[in-house]
Amino acid sequence: MNLLTIFNILPLGEGFGFNDNILETNIINLAAVVGIVVFFVGKNFSILLENRQQTILNNLREANQRASEALERYNQAKKQLELAEKKAKDIRQEGTLKARQEKENCFNQYKLDLVRLEEYKQETLQFYQQKAFQQIYVSIVSRALGEVKQKFNKPLSEQFHATINNFVIARLTEYNP
């Protein structure tokens, strides 16, 4: 066949072209289109898939790393919490102990103050008793001296004079050198 016959077979104006109606295309045209698409797009698609796979793997690695960091921070926070709870418990116990000691110290100080106050009270009472006794003693002695003075100022009676002489004689007879 020559070239003219081929041109004569083909209707004018139709020529080679792409049939865009899929239902009218045959399997060969469809296979050719799929082959061309796979050939040109397949490489780009496989590159895109590899890039996507690499991105997903990187994201998984980063997620695992962040998860391990988060777990490590969680463990550190847990340790810090336990340490803080232990310190709080120690502080609470120490506070309770100090409160007890302070209470006991205050109670002991109160007892000592009561003892000192009682001693001071006794000393004060004793001082005022001694002062009162001294005043009474001074009063009695001054009265007695006053009465003696009055008796000396009065003339002595015979009976009193005889009593004194008898007393002095009795004392002298008792005296043995």
Curated annotation (Swiss-Prot):
InterPro entries to which the protein is assigned, alphabetical: ATP_synth_b/b'su_bac/chlpt
Record carries keyword Lipid metabolism: no
Superkingdom classification of source: Eukaryota
Membrane-spanning residues: 22-42
Pfam families associated with the record: ATP-synt_B
GO molecular-function terms, A-Z: proton-transporting ATP synthase activity, rotational mechanism
Record's signal peptide: none
Keyword annotations from UniProtKB, A to Z: ATP synthesis, CF(0), Chloroplast, Hydrogen ion transport, Ion transport, Membrane, Plastid, Thylakoid, Transmembrane, Transmembrane helix, Transport
Further information: In plastids the F-type ATPase is also known as CF(1)CF(0).
Protein name as annotated: ATP synthase subunit b, chloroplastic
Gene name, Swiss-Prot/TrEMBL: atpF
